[in-house]
Amino acid sequence: KAQYILAVMYENGEGVSQNYAGAVKLYRLAAEQGNAEAQNNLAVSYATGKGLIQDYVMAHMWWNLANANGNKNGGINRDRIAEDMTNADIEKAVAMAQECFNSAYAKCGY
């Protein structure tokens, strides 16, 4: 939870200099521990390209995981971004989410 809170601070420049790459690093650490809010925010970073290279497949994967872990925005955002993706990319993202989840977040597409 602390990693997630610090990531939000980095993303928004609250009490620290704004640092999107730093936020992404912390979101990823929290996301890999199953934090659904961090998974959602990491997906937003992938979708927007803030702090890393834009990647809709990775965004879809993390939103899928966030949704599975109880973050309602994850499902909403996943479905929205899917409208701009090919079926092949959606299938890839779903398979990656399954592998990530089944590996206890050890194999998450990077």
Task: For the regions a language model picked out, list residue spans one by one.
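Hydrophobic face of amphipathic alpha-helices that form TPR/SEL1-like repeat modules
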Residues: 3-12, 16, 26, 41-48, ...
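Short N-proximal segments of mature Sec-exported proteins
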Residues: 3, 40-47, 53, 57-68
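Terminal, low-structured helical/coil segments at or just beyond the last alpha-helical repeat
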Residues: 72-110
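Conserved structural position within tetratricopeptide repeats
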Residues: 29-32, 65-68, 102
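Structural signature of tandem alpha-helical TPR/SEL1-like repeats
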Residues: 17-29, 53-61, 88-92
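Start-of-helix register in tetratricopeptide repeats
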Residues: 1, 5, 37, 58, ...
